[in-house]
Amino acid sequence: DRSRGLGDVYKRQVKELDSRQTLVKKVSIVPLEVIVRNISAGSFAKHYGVEEGIVFEHPTIEFSYKNDALGDPLLNTYHALALKLATPEEIKTIEDYSFRINEALKAFWLTCGVTLVDFKLEFGRLSDGTIVLADEISPDTSRLWDVKTHEKLDKDRFRRDLGGVEEAYAETVSYTHLRAHETDQYL
């Protein structure tokens, strides 16, 4: 059931110290980057030779091996298991959390007039082995498009030399500030 709350995903967070700092528990990082995709864009469109903007009937998950020396290659769950990057139970938990986070983020961004195209996640293990979200979720880790115009509101503006990076980020921040008081309903 992907509609459950996300409290179990955030067990790492102890408390917010201020608007820019959060006290968290130490984790050992699972060396998998998880990319959740709702719409074809970026490397997905390039790798599979499809147009950007195709809305998927079901979101997809891609894993890449967090290894700079190897260029963070894409891999599937069988590769992750063979390389002992995670156990079958951990992979299942990571996939479940990723889909649940996706549903919450899509709902939140839609209220802001923004489409969540895709985003990346990183997970870690607490000292007791519990899998938790271990990295930020932000416009820097997400691909966001204006619902009506499909204007890119994320770092693709920089990557593709579209200009207006600061303005797009400011617009995104204004969306989130307008809805910040409502975020509990998505968690």
Explain the meaning of each model-derived region:
Residues 54-71, 102-115, 138-143:
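Phosphate-binding core of ATP-grasp and ATP-grasp-like enzymes
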Residues 137-179:
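C-terminal helix-cap and adjacent tail motif
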Residues 85-117:
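A long amphipathic alpha-helix within ATP-dependent nucleotide-binding catalytic cores
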Residues 1-10, 177-180, 184-187:
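Single conserved hydrophobic/aromatic residue that forms the stacking wall/gate
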Residues 46-48, 74, 129-137:
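Short, well-ordered strand-loop elements centered on a beta-strand within folded domains, enriched
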Residues 36, 116-135:
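Conserved metal-phosphate-binding beta-hairpin within the catalytic cores
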